[in-house]
Amino acid sequence: MTDAAKPGTTDDTDICLMLSLPERIQQMNIGVLRSMLQKGCIPLVVTVNQPYRILMKRYAKEGLDPQKIFIIDAVTQYSGGMCDDGQNVRYVTNPANLTDLGIAITEMLKQNPDQRKCIVFDSVSMLLIHIPSVTASKFLHFVMNKLRLTNVDGIFLCVEKGLDPVILTQLSSFVDRIVEFDSPEQGAGLATITS
């Protein structure tokens, strides 16, 4: 595991870019959520990767309580799927609709105001398929600063070799640290993010 912390970080939030091999990104998602829930943190998953219904089934299969996980789904409507009603889900028409995505994030952050929350963005790599890299970089910078201003931790998942070096450099300057994900147990090592 490589974990490079940025010196001089003094605030209470932790913004982390987690890199994984493509075949391990789902394990990374599960490991991160498991760690958050064990620490009493409310996970808010922003998915531009898989639909809400699929994620909920996977989380339940992995022993995670779907009722404790909030989802912003930018995939279901885009793919022509049916949107399930639910208190823990907000739908955005497509991953390129950054205005609605930003509004949904803001609204979900306002829910449960007295509880510690953490955003998991799944995934930066998939977002880059839908929008130009410059636009993605600006949007992610906006989201990361919103998290800092609201004292919410953020974990941004990404396929390790899926980023242009320029984008990786930009994101590296936005985050507090970069973690290379090696195993499902590593999600438990994220105590500094969710404690």
Task: Cite the ranges covered by each PLM segment.
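Glycine-rich P-loop/Walker A and Walker A-like loops and their local beta1-loop-alpha1 context
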Residues: 1-58
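Nucleotide-state-sensitive switch-loop elements of NTP-binding domains
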Residues: 4-7, 13, 61-95
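Structural motif
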Residues: 17, 44, 118-121, 155
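Short, structured coil segments at secondary-structure junctions
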Residues: 39, 65, 173-175
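Short, charged/polar "capping" segments at the starts of alpha-helices
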Residues: 51-56, 79-80, 163-166
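Phosphate-binding/switch loop-helix module in NTP-utilizing enzymes
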Residues: 81-142
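Substrate-engagement module of ASCE P-loop NTPases
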Residues: 136-162
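Phosphate-binding/switch region of NTP-binding enzymes
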Residues: 152-153, 158-195
